[in-house]
Amino acid sequence: MGQKVNPTGIRLGIVKDHRSVWYAERGAYADKLNNDLEVRRFLEQRLKNASVSDITIERPANNARITIHTARPGIVIGKKGEDVDRLRRDVSEMMGVPVHVNIEEVRKPELDAQLVAQNVCGQLERRVMFRRAMKRAVQNAMRLGAGGIKIQLSGRLGGAEIARTEWYREGRVPLHTLRADIDYATYEAHTTYGVIGVKVWVFKGEILGGIEEVRAKQKQAQAPAPKKKGSR
């Protein structure tokens, strides 16, 4: 009754790709998975001010490739690339293999569920009224072309004695349509009254080409831009 499956999990292999891309030998899967979780926790803690949206981990033969999706790549890279070099060394030490770090910029953070959730949590921790924070985030997303967005808050909203759940939605968020590109994220706001949980669903349109279309777009985004020929 009223229980909802994780929108990302149900779409894996249909219109969503895995965040960890590798195969493990027999008996090594648990260690690699635990190592992935440790690396993610380390990166999220180290880059908590860099507006990190997603971290993808790939493990080709005897090395690793980590792609960090962020709205503020300058903070991740640091002055003359010093921060990203230090990050690469630390992660390589944790994983025990050479690591290559890619930085991808999120051009529209208002349409990224993880960044929207972080933004709402930041406002709640600064004591902005929760309804105002929700409404502002929803309006920004719709203004930039989202098909629909829903934000749900749970906890002692406004310092109330009894915890409750409130949500706000604009547009359409078709959770039952598997070809729908639903970006889903959760985050926690630590306020003086306690923890407030934030959930965000962003509908970005339908993907008719399936997972192949998603992977083709990812490769296109990662490909280096062609060099422009100078005018004579």
From Swiss-Prot:
Ranges in a coiled coil: none
Record keywords, A-Z: Ribonucleoprotein, Ribosomal protein, RNA-binding, rRNA-binding
Keyword Ribosomal protein (UniProt): yes
Domain of life: Bacteria
An annotated GO BP: translation
PROSITE patterns referenced in this protein's UniProt entry, alphabetically: KH_TYPE_2, RIBOSOMAL_S3
Keyword Transmembrane helix: no
Gene Ontology cellular component list: cytosolic small ribosomal subunit
Domain KH type-2 positions: 39-107
GO molecular function: mRNA binding; rRNA binding; structural constituent of ribosome
Pfam families (alphabetical): KH_2 (PF07650), Ribosomal_S3_C (PF00189)
InterPro entries found in the cross-reference section: KH_dom, KH_dom-like_a/b, KH_dom_type_2, KH_sf_prok-type, Ribosomal_S3_C_sf, Ribosomal_uS3_bac-typ, Ribosomal_uS3_C, Ribosomal_uS3_CS
Subunit structure: Part of the 30S ribosomal subunit. Forms a tight complex with proteins S10 and S14.
Record's function text: Binds the lower part of the 30S subunit head. Binds mRNA in the 70S ribosome, positioning it for translation.
NCBIfam families: rpsC_bact
Family: Belongs to the universal ribosomal protein uS3 family.
Protein's name according to its UniProt entry: Small ribosomal subunit protein uS3
Organism name: Chromohalobacter salexigens (strain ATCC BAA-138 / DSM 3043 / CIP 106854 / NCIMB 13768 / 1H11)
Gene name of this polypeptide: rpsC
